[in-house]
Amino acid sequence: MMEVKAAELVAALKNSNMSVDTKVAHLQCVKSDIKQKNVPEGAVPSIFESIRLAIASQHSSLSGAGFSTLGHFLKRLLIQELHHLVALQCRALYPLLVERLGDHKERIRAQAAQSFTDMWLAAPEEVEQCVLGQALVGKNPRAKEMSMIWLSNVSSSFNIGGFSSFLTIALQMTKNYGLLFRSYVSSLVACLEDADSNVRNTAKNTVIELFENASERAKSDLKRQMATHNVRKSFVNAILASIDHGTSDMDAASRPISRAEALVHRPVSRAETQASRSVSRLDTHQRPASRMELAQSSVLHTEALPPRPVSVLSSRSETHKEVTKEVIGVERPKSRLTTAKSEPNWAVVSHTGPAEELPLPSSRPASQEGEKIDALYVSSSRQVDELFRDMMPHFEGRESEDNWIRREKDVLTLRRLTHGNAPDDYSPAYLAGLKTLLDGIFKVVNSLRTTLSTIGCLLIQDIAKRCGPRIDSMVEIMMQNLIKLCSGMKKISAQNGNATVDALIENVTFTTRILQHVSGACQDKNVQLRLFAAGWLKTLIQKQSHHKSSIEHGGGLDMMEKSVKKCLADANPGVREAMRSTFWTYYRVWPNRANEILSNLDPKSRSLLEKDPANPNAHQSAPKDSGPSRKGLANGTSSLAGRSALKEAIAAQKKARLAPAKAVPPPRPESAQSALSDKHSSAPSSSKSSVRTVPTGTSLSSLSSAPVRPAAKPRRPELNRPATADPYAARRSVATDSSTRHGNQIDGSPSAAKSKSSTPSLKSVSSTGSRDRADPVGTTRDRPKRLVISKTRSHDTHTRQHSKPIPTHSRKNSNESIPRHSPLRSEFSVTPISPNSVSLETPSTPRSHLVQDHGNLIAIASPPTHIQRTPIEPDASAEDPREHAAKATPVAIFEDTTPARSDHDDIQDAAMTLTENQTPQPSKVHSDSPIVSNKRVSNQDESVPHLTTGLGFLTGVGSVVEASELPNSDAQTDQSLFADHSLPVTHQPDSVTDSSKPSGLSSSLMVAGSPIRVANNENEIVIDSKTTHVSLPHRSSPKHNVLGELTSNEPSQRANKQIRHAANKLEDEVTTPIDDHSRHRWKKVEIADRRTSISPRSKDPTKAQQMLDKGIQRIRTKTMDILGYRKLQGIIKYHDSIFTNEEKYDEMLLALLDELESSPDDKRQPLGRPLDLKTQVLLTIRLMLIHNKIYFSAYCSRALGALVLARKYYDANCHIVSGLEETADDIIALCEPAAVIDSVLDVIITEEKDDREYRSILMGVSVLTRILSRLNADKCRVPELPLDRLGQFAASKLADRQPDVRRLAVQLCVQLHGMVANEEEYWRVLGHPRENSRNLLTYYILKK
């Protein structure tokens, strides 16, 4: 019968669907049978297995019932003399019981120790090996402590009981230190120097108990072992003194009582006899302490040793404590956790003396933390309760003149009690009393009396250091009150609160709530609180440095990183300085995350951080002007030379501004200037000015991180122009010319670039550009530069997006040009001019070329050009420039349709179409052509497009062509035609100009992405009469219009919505749903792409086929640019039968998929951003899908894999992510589910678990969920689906560290439920997840 019950019990315990109460009832039923009946041998294995399952349970009721059943079961088997079965079956329980010895609950640890005690009767060697050979030498401090207590209890309890002669002999061997115990003496003595204070004190007490009656030989062996392990002196003296006094227990118990009464009560009685004498209260309170010192010196036989700097909870004078306890005869506490932090003075509460007879403390204690506190010892929990009960009335109500002194005395009494034995020997009563008085204690802490508040804070510190994790339940209310205290205005109280919070964090158990408090303090508006929080965070990192998982798994690492970033960029320098030390502590624990923070700092902050004394790599980094400061850290630059140079530049500028204006002769005619160009070029070359980018708001130097203050009177210096070029030059004042010349020589601002007139000749343009860039490249970093702050918001926006210093080119670099056969001149690499490459000059600034200086634009004066035939009124220059800009002026966009000379130029012609909003591409001067070639520079994500005031044409290869160089360009234009810099470019319908004026050009402004083909001959420009007009509408005020970023393919009429910055955390990168703003941007990209038109040559099927072959080859070699992809899209849309066979389609599609899943490369593309290039790749793939779904269906799995892999390169707010999601939806609707699921699983299973790879995992799980959702919606079950593989993957992601992955995994499991026949099969497919995961899935399945 019992065999059947045992089998049913095992089945019930293994059934995860059965409730805990039912399992406990089954176990109790079997335990009742064990207590009443003999156990058959056939039922023994089943009962042992059921007990193992019960003890391993996480439910306290079930594990407790298991321990209880084990105790009765072992006794029954020993009564039946089945020792061999016990020894055999208990081997499966040993590892579990050793683990339970280190449990955080004391009750579980005690039950595990008792189980080992019961098993010891049947298998002593195995039990001792588990307890003393494994737990005692392990890493768990609780297990060590419990194993020593078990050893002491076994040695004492069984000698009293005397169950059998065998047991008595065995224990006598242990007590006499025979062979059974001698092998564990070394491990026991090693625990005397353990890192945990509780283990040290327990080891000391255990050694004393075991060696009390030992032989001299055993004591000598003990001394030798302690010397070998270098045990601290205080422990050695206390142990030796205790085992020496333990020879006659009866004497030690009878003698010291009278001595104790004489020694303890004598000072009190003398104080009472002197009570009638009128003395000060302070004298009365201090007399008992002096008598106690005299009494102590007469009782103690050894001098007090100075305390060693050990851990917070370690004892300081254990010798005096142990000797006094034996002398007074107080019963030794049964707990081993005696960690009294006592000083040479103490008092003992007698059993009969009331609380009122205690020596009164000093009314004005010192506020120092290192003051000496007289430890107060109690002998029962009843006395602890009485002490707290007597204190309760003093803390009621508000603080007054009557109760504050009593509160002060009570708090000091609590400190003495905390330093005594109450927290260890009578911990429940002590902690319960603290909870009742906690409200009153914080009334003292928050008192306006500084002394009272100080002793309250010291009490909290003592409690934290003494009790440690035992006050975890009170930490929340303590942190709230102490942080409030730290934010107060009183410096002493705030400092005390800071020290108290630090002690609390250091000693209690770490929880996420503590980190939330610290993180909140880091972001508080109170500067003092943020300053303290930096130290708290450092303490927290140091405390948890060996337990990083407790911070990482709870989301605390992100919270900590956010706090560090916040304080490193704090407005207060003190907070920044305090957080630098904390940062390097953070760096030692999480170096990779710290490097990310360091790399995102500005140069000045990074330099100060690297120079901090706490930097562990400070000895490795030498001060350099440039280059990386150390391996693994971000590159840093020295700003010392830059600061001095900046000061010199400011002084020189001020001196020039205060200098009197000198008259200068009018500029010479153009012919004269050309003849004397060599002479005049020497002066600007010797100056320290540098020509820089026209958008003057750009941050061009890292000399100072502070904003540059604009001059008191902003000036716009004029460019020096020939007198023959401007009929109104006489109106310009002499003072203006003088200030212009001085500004050119000193500040080097872009608007003050001095150059001579540019003529159509090659030499003039080249010499002008090189003359302004005569300084070497190496001297640019430390050269002072003046930042001209513009009034428009466009400049301010642009300022925040460039932070790198701009080095200048020497003369020899100015002659560089792009080779004639470089990729820039290939079929699919025609570079359009971006809006950012045009000038933002003032209305009075002369017309100029746009020239690139190492990736930045400079203004070079151009000769007067005549574009319009409409004459200008004589007083037109005196009018407001905005009146001219208000007139809608058409802009001519030309497309060359003449036959080309080669296939090379044919495709180039076809690629020149009108597009808008291209990514910025500045220009660069070269010497062999008047056309300014393009050199690709790095792009910012939010660049601001600008307009130009120069009247040159921007060509298809990024060039500027003077209007005077064009044939028949004799029309005049208004000087201030494009004076309004904030006017956006709007797209108007195409129109054809008058054929009678083929060369009449209305403007030189080019829309980005609208190239004009220029022949290789430098004097030949082929421009067709067909034009596209873009008008400039009038705006009321240019100050309120900010030109924001427009991505490629986006129409000019953009939505006026704030740009959402890319988030750095993975939590924001949820795959579905994509935010509406990103979807809106993607729709605009697709709509703009549909407007792409093709040239007549591309309409020829034969030519189109040739272009397609060349395009495929360029995609494979990764030399295709944005315009090439648009050309391919136009060809595919126009020719329905462009793919004559499936092989050509497959070749094209595979090349596109390979390009899509490759990493974006900034350096590879000469045109546009990598994001824009990948957008065109994705649009081409979508077009291939729409063009022929039958051909595409064979590559559904390959395409989905490429989409999932490509997802990891983009943030969630990139518009291309919306395109990836929509393309995946289209493929899901077309594909076969079984093959696609395997392909997606193959991709995401191999991904690494870092932040970038999680993007692919998120999208992959989302794709799988949508596939199953589609099948469930159609109510069809596909037998070929890899359900087992899906279930295994979903179950593994239910416990992932990323919450978004867990959320999507739950959705996948819910959809998977609809594909499985029944519940049992469903849980089998998921691998029988844990109970909490099962409950969560059940909830969502039922909710569905």
UniProtKB/Swiss-Prot annotation:
Residues 691-705, 735-747, 828-847, 914-942 have a biased composition (Polar residues). GO terms for molecular function: microtubule binding. Keywords: Cell cycle, Cell division, Cytoplasm, Cytoskeleton, Microtubule, Mitosis, Nucleus, Repeat. GO terms for cellular component: cytoplasmic microtubule; microtubule organizing center; mitotic spindle; mitotic spindle midzone; nucleus; spindle microtubule. GO terms for biological process: astral microtubule depolymerization; cell division; mitotic spindle assembly. Gene3D superfamilies: Leucine-rich Repeat Variant. HEAT repeats lie at residues 93-131, 508-544. Residues 265-292, 606-637, 651-847, 914-945, 984-1004, 1031-1054 are annotated as: Disordered. This is Protein stu1.
